[in-house]
């Protein structure tokens, strides 16, 4: 992407694998990357040159596959435009910081990453359910970053997006399942 000047943010599993004590503790079934929709033709060209097949696009994702098992989801937006959280998450490419060693690859703040992870997981929960890995991801992320998170910002954003209660429940479940007795992380 750097060579083709495609601004991007790797999402979810790409960074979560690095949060675990060993990367093989966290599986990924596809790679999700946020990009600027205006660069869709360049993205298609790059993946074609790398041997990927363009499968389809929907209102916010472009899907690519390379057999036998590599799947890429290029996200033009973090959430669908009709979702309540869209206005709060739409400018993530502009809000993120450049990753070390890259000219066009960025990363979200820890707070925005956690918020996006929760929004993504809550959509799965609402549509069809979520598994233990999503709860474990929350636990691992919070354990790794609890001392550096801006909880005032998180509380405000979680309320605005409408997932504050959801976040609290997921956090309670995560710490009940995966921590020593009585360990708890509070946001207040």
Explain the meaning of each model-derived region:
Residues 1-29, 35-188:
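Conserved NTP-donor binding/palm subdomain of two-metal-ion nucleotidyltransferases/polymerases, i.e.
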């Amino acid at each position: 992407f750097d060579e083709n000047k495609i601004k991007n943010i790797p999402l979810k599993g790409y960074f979560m694998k690095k949060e675990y004590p060993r990367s093989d503790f966290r599986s990924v079934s596809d790679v999700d990357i946020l990009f600027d929709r205006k660069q869709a033709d360049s993205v298609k060209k790059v993946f074609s040159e790398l041997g990927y097949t363009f499968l389809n696009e929907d209102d916010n994702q472009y899907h690519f596959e390379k057999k036998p098992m590599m799947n890429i989801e290029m996200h033009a937006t973090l959430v669908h435009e009709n979702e309540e959280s869209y206005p709060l998450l739409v400018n993530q490419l502009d809000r993120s910081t450049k990753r070390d060693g890259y000219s066009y690859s960025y990363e979200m703040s820890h707070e925005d990453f956690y918020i996006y992870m929760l929004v993504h997981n809550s959509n799965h929960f609402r549509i069809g359910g979520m598994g233990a890995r999503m709860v474990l991801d929350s636990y691992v992320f919070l354990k790794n970053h609890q001392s550096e998170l801006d909880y005032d910002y998180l509380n405000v954003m979680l309320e605005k997006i409408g997932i504050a209660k959801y976040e609290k429940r997921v956090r309670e479940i995560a710490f009940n399942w995966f921590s020593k007795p009585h360990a708890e992380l509070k946001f207040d």
